[in-house]
Amino acid sequence: MKTFCKAVTRGRYVIIAICLLLMIPAAIGYKNTKINYDIVSYLPSDVETMKGQDILSKEFKQGAFAVVITDNMSTKQILNLEDRIKDVKTVNKVGSVYDILGYSFPVQMLPSDIASKVQKGDKNLILVTFTNSTSDDATLKAVEKIRGLKKSIQVAGMSATTLDTAQIANSEVIMYVIIAVALCLIVLMLTLDSFFVPFLLLGNIGVAIVYNLGSNLFLGQISYITKAIAAVLQLGVTMDFSIFLYHKFEYWKTQRDNKLEAMDEAIAETMISVIGSSTTTIAGFLALCTMKLTLGVDIGVVMAKGVAFGVLTVVTLFPALVLVFDPIITKTAHKSVVPDLSFIKRFVLKHYKIVLTVFVIGLPLSYYAQSRTQSYYNLTAGLPSYLPGVKANDVLKKDFKIVSPYFILVDSKMDATDVKKMVDQIDDLKGIDMTASIAKLSSQGITEDMMPDDIKDMVDNGKYQIILLSSKYDTATDQLNSQIAHVSKIAKSYDKHAIVAGEGPLMRDMVTIADTDFTNVNSTSIGVVFVIMLFVLKSISLPVLLVLAIEFAIFINMGIPFMMGTKIPFVASIVIGTIQLGATIDYAILMSTKYLEIRQGGGDKVQAVSTAMDASLQSIFVSALCFFAATVGVGIYSSMDMISTICSMISRGALISMIDVAFIAPSLLLVFDKVITHTSLGFKKKGA
């Protein structure tokens, strides 16, 4: 370790040069990393609805679809518009009711339930399918091109809202970083003793962030959620590593003859402390990889990498920067304005039994509250209402009463009589307000011979045929999920290989998988962090007590939406607990490590807790404030509810964990001191 430390301090200029040069390939990697804006694509491939999507993509060459809404256009103008849409790159098929009826027949010739879904007043619908997937760049460019063909048209569907998501996410992501950096800078300016050090801290973390984002190229792609929150989370989580090294350097400067030797000692202490504590944080993020929804792998791996890069730059680049700019640091020194927190220590030492009583009463209550917090799964519900795709979807709902369209894939060779019977049964289900199939149209006098090949190819490829459905129920509701189950049962009674797919069924699978993921991720993160703490603290009881303390903070944070009567995005409900546990358990470890040191040295429990609080409260305060600052601004600024909620809850969680560790953790140490000393290694009998 000494050799490494000396290599860093003596080779500081080389390290700075290498780190800056590595920014070039990292920046190239960042620019070329594909971003996925379709959360549905993270569902497991073995889910039936994903198999349905796969059939659409491979067998029908329909990777995505959109609905074009025309207004006050004649039949001739609509057909001309269709021709223009067909010329757009990656568009596969285009069709409307006028391709079947032409100029001569009125829409009223169609079955009434179908007619009301394709024409309403002066508005008409055109169905467009794309060769590529919903979130593919080519599809998004095609949707954008179609929107620009005529000012009066609107484009609805998942591809349209995915484009909106991409555009708003890309327009805001730079502001997320700017806001996070600005707020962190304010906190650091106030809490550190030099006006220049904050710039070095942020510069060092900025390099680590670029490395992390650049290395995502090797993952193939990352989600827009990961892209939006990765930088601010990495900033908030790893900031205290750099602060720890800086404080150690300032201390050792008073104990050694020169600053190089002081930095050697600071790096050595930082490596021992930070590598140990960062392991719990990394483990917490990697617990997200247990999610069946592979978005968890996406976020977990990226954030675990971010922490690792943060540790690496803290023990290499940051010491080099501090040594090179030490004269400026000295010249810009000022008095820190961190408040005296000794009043917390005095309160806890005097009233720890009351604090613990609050904890014992609050733990089950907060658990109940968080278990009652509701999530929403409708991915468009969290988008701003002014977006063109959201507006178009609203037109479909309000004017055409198309709330949740989905479809059934059945054998193309199924007898037309059986298809009609099946469709009739489905029509009788509560909430179904439209079904459409070739067999149904044929029974109304519109034969296959009357249909253009493009229309027939959209719904029958010789191997599979598609039956379209429309439901009155909103996506991701219990009513729709129940309806889908009944539709599936009916369809499979006619064709055991039938598949019910589309946005509604996909969201139904999302609900089922998310509920499982929530349980798995939380239990895995707690288990992994617990095991690591067993080795770090060499104690059986302390990990239990500290995890309970942090879980209490998590329960409070997750229970607040229930108490406020609000719903949160389902992704937030899964990842918040793990992120908060992994990022803030270090607060509790920092305090308990000092407590163990004093107790194992022969000090009594009051002395140990008192010293531990003196040594850790200010560090916890600064670290939590930085974490809060890095995320709260994004939570307020973001117009995307998914990003806003995640960042708001993380920032709130940082403050709750800070208060929790400041009051609950030392109270637990005092009350369970005897248990701890008898279940931990390294204690002397005297004073135990």
Report each predicted region and the residues it spans.
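Structured non-transmembrane domains adjacent to transmembrane bundles in polytopic membrane proteins
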Residues: 45-65, 70-159, 374, 380-542, ...
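Membrane-embedded transmembrane helical bundles of large multi-pass transporters/channels
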Residues: 1-35, 41, 134-377, 492-688
